[in-house]
Amino acid sequence: MPTINQLVRKPRQMDVVKSKVPALEACPQKRGVCTRVYTTTPKKPNSALRKVAKVRLTNGFEVISYIGGEGHNLQEHSVVLIRGGRVKDLPGVRYHIVRGSLDLQGVKDRKQSRSKYGAKRPKKA
């Protein structure tokens, strides 16, 4: 155990916490342009064609982000908003694209969890 004098000379070091979403640079979201929109397969034991996009952000970072929901209208040069949040079965995908913001439309005919998919409230019959 160090003496008071030793602590005065050299204080205790705090643990440095590494960010899980470095490209956001401590911002809640960032804007970017899609450079490639494609599908990829998840790790074992899952099987699917997951929709992802490579996005060049305004700060110069190039990241892979996930497009959630059923169907999307993204193509190359679409402007999107990304947020943090990884996809557990897709290695290297640490960001999500925000639905219903900028060029990406919300999910059509979505009834539940609408706010997460940028869907408007359905009209009453």
Curated annotation (Swiss-Prot):
Domain of life, source organism: Bacteria
Comp. bias (Basic residues): 113-125
GO annotation, cellular component aspect: small ribosomal subunit
GO molecular function, one term: structural constituent of ribosome
Span list, region Disordered: 106-125
Keywords: Methylation, Ribonucleoprotein, Ribosomal protein, RNA-binding, rRNA-binding, tRNA-binding
Matching Gene3D superfamilies: Nucleic acid-binding proteins
GO biological process annotation, one example: translation
Residues bearing PTM 3-methylthioaspartic acid: D89
Family named by the database record: Belongs to the universal ribosomal protein uS12 family.
Oligomeric and partner information: Part of the 30S ribosomal subunit. Contacts proteins S8 and S17. May interact with IF1 in the 30S initiation complex.
Function in brief: With S4 and S5 plays an important role in translational accuracy.
Stated name of the protein: Small ribosomal subunit protein uS12
Gene designation: rpsL
